[in-house]
UniProtKB/Swiss-Prot annotation:
Role, per record: 5' to 3' helicase that unwinds RNA and DNA duplexes in an ATP-dependent reaction. Specific to 5'-phosphorylated single-stranded guanine-rich sequences. May play a role in RNA metabolism, ribosome biogenesis or initiation of translation. May play a role in regulation of transcription. Interacts with tRNA-Tyr.
Name of the gene this protein is made from: Ighmbp2
UniProt name for this protein: DNA-binding protein SMUBP-2
GO-annotated molecular function: 5'-3' DNA helicase activity; 5'-3' RNA helicase activity; ATP binding; ATP hydrolysis activity; ATP-dependent activity, acting on DNA; ATP-dependent activity, acting on RNA; DNA binding; double-stranded DNA helicase activity
Residue ranges with Low complexity bias: 802-817
Organism (species): Rattus norvegicus
Biased composition (Basic and acidic residues): 765-775, 949-971
Amino acid sequence: MASYTVESFVAQQLQLLELERDAEVEERRSWQEHSSLKELQSRGVCLLKLQVSGQRTGLYGQRLVTFEPRKFGPAVVLPSNSFTSGDIVGLYDTNESSQLATGVLTRITQKSVIVAFDESHDFQLNLDRENTYRLLKLANDVTYKRLKKALLTLKKYHSGPASSLIDVLLGGSTPSPATEIPPLTFYNTTLDPSQKEAVSFALAQKEVAIIHGPPGTGKTTTVVEIILQAVKQGLKVLCCAPSNIAVDNLVERLALCKKQILRLGHPARLLESVQQHSLDAVLARSDNAQIVADIRRDIDQVFGKNKKTQDKREKSNFRNEIKLLRKELKEREEAAIVQSLSAADVVLATNTGASTDGPLKLLPEDYFDVVVVDECAQALEASCWIPLLKAPKCILAGDHKQLPPTTVSHKAALAGLSRSLMERLAEKHGAAVVRMLAVQYRMHQAITRWASEAMYHGQLTAHPSVAGHLLKDLPGVADTEETSVPLLLIDTAGCGLLELEEEDSQSKGNPGEVRLVTLHIQALVDAGVQAGDIAVIAPYNLQVDLLRQSLSNKHPELEIKSVDGFQGREKEAVILTFVRSNRKGEVGFLAEDRRINVAVTRARRHVAVICDSHTVNNHAFLKTLVDYFTEHGEVRTAFEYLDDIVPENYTHEGSRSHSCAPKPKCPTTSVRKPASAQESRQEARAATGHSRRKPSEKPLGSQVQPQHSSKANGSDRTGGTDRTEHFRAMIEEFVASKEAQLEFPTSLSSHDRLRVHQLAEEFGLKHDSTGEGKARHITVSRRSPAGSGSATPQPPSPPSPAQAEPEPQVEQPVGQPHGSTQLDLKALHLERLQRQQGCQAQSQLGGGSRPQKAPQKKKKKEPKGPAMALPSEEDFDALVSAVVKADNTCSFTKCSASTTTLGQFCMHCSRRYCLSHHLPEIHGCGEKARAHARQRISREGVLYAGSGTKDRALDPAKRAQLQRKLDKKLGELSSQRTSKKKEKERGT
């Protein structure tokens, strides 16, 4: 064995662990010194105002204390937090700053948390059910000590069952040739060829085998088959993973195969479905179970007596009795543990749970024949060495193309701490030790193809059973635009939906993307998709909090988490919000390619990505994702949602609430009132010059070319140019004729109709699009005369460069972020708003040439021609005056009251109304007002009565509790005085 290699490796790992440990301690210290308790709770590292709800004795005599939120009730839950089983926590009294005790968190649910305290705190820890406490997450000394101990053991390891394995893993020797094994009879007959090959390969290898399982390829199924085949050969297997969830997943699968399995770890840390296989449960079924139970009961009784007595001599006797009982308990439990371990075919534990500090210290050094480490790519290499030293062979399973091990120290991560054992061996030995599973059973083929090309060298394929499945194929789900596509990109580029800039730059948020997510989820739910089948993934905790505030009340089953919380999970639909949108093009946390791979591959049937393409395209890997979605998916711009989302930096004219009765409209908008958000998005596409392309459609001459096409003016566009000229000729002929209207056939495509809309606008004609689906058609008609102008529209003269409008640029492919012919969506939208404003002003000026006897009110009712149709010599000052006058008039339909002196501004639609119509429920903003009130209540957690202030009266329950506490205290003082008085009387 190359001792120098071992020594240098151990020295490097210890140095990296020390950096990580120091960074973790410094982070905790900084939080405690510079953050308030509420800030710590918002960070997820502190739980406030807890009460003791129960105490009992657990395994090895540990004291288990259950804490719950102070206010009891069915709806009271713990706040969002980052506590997990195994965390070291500090216990504090709410009214004191000193720490009462240190314990290990063994179980946490939405409503309670259980902490285990060792025997050293038994007599110092006196917890009162009436008091309130807080728990603070501390740096995990236990894990650090176990990792350090394993590395030091490796350094001193000279002879033993793992000697050859250590040589191979540290580069002292090459892997031995595979041995010949007889043909296998598989327990699982549905394994695909790549899975069967991986099983045979793992069993044939002498020292090490790596099973590379990309998302959805059945890695756990393959690992279970390997374990069963090893047990069949008479081998003793130790199976580990870095997390309790991963270990419990294997326990559930192995339990179905009726093998003797034993799960190490306290049952409070395990899933309920596997607790029967825990060491504690097995011991409870053993011959010594009743004796052990009697000893524990005796310990609890002695604790009770010790708590009641005040005599020091009796307390000392009780302590000695407890020590003797614990000694007997330990001896009987160890004998039962050895018996249980020997009877098991497979022993399962976390990496750190397999240390010599636990039950495995009772077994011989060479007891196990093979060690299996699942999810190895997520584990620190130092943690893997804890179980690896217990057997001559190891089988590693995982995916090093997904999330790496979690670290706090950026310096340690760059120096190699975040590089897993699996990744290091795969790069060093390649195919000699690695077999990859090539068929996935989760994702639609469009999702699979991107992951395969981006991360897995094109080797990953979709099984036919999932290759074409979509959301619309689920029971009860309708066929809509959202449910019929596997890939959807909502691009916020140029829409003003910028990220929130935090001072500490620790986390980012994007309220605009939150609103887009909300609208898309509502569209999916309206189509019949269950909220529990949808996941929202964000890379930043601040964005996760914003999403939960907006969505959790309405959709409680909806899962909203960070990327790290979703590895190993899957959902029918996944919505990704990338958050980053800034002028510098900084992507920050998104630069981790493996993080994006995990996020995208959580979806089975539908992935929606919401991002700013201008920002994310500055990162090469993210640009490949955007380009792929553009080529194979459906692309929308956030402008399609402008009826529901208005960027904060837009003026109020752009927010035309569809809940109000419409004012006269300019011709760029449809004359029909939108019946749904989907229809309003279609109108927005027509107004901004965008049409969408579904992945199944080929780019034809009459359709917009996909973004990836480079033939903007080539032969592929000839057909589109010819059709435009054909439509232009038809409209010119109509203008020259005396016909009142021109109807176009229903056979026109959506883009053909867009061309007709644009041409009609050029000629100053009225253009209406009516009908639904295949019955949709366009009618072009003449406008009413404006002022003294002619009723016959004139063909437009060629515009000068200064007058040129951006409409002809609509042929530019959608979504290209760079290029000289880039279509500026924001400029188009602002121009549309300007035209709408001009239309409104013209409606105020249009009656100037009518007889004086006509009433002024009558003139305001009649819509006039658009601003674009006004003569070029129109007095600009008059136009401005008209706009100002319109702005000082009540925005409610059929109301001409002035709002110059007495008017109210509506925060929901950004308009002014007179006192008769200023209430949101009257002028059409009632729903928005109710939504705002709900959001405020959800955010502040306080229900306000009208516009009054918060009721600061003492809560009746709290008052009653304090009264009971006072009465109890008075009773105790009274009894003490009575007893002293009696003693005094006896003395006399």
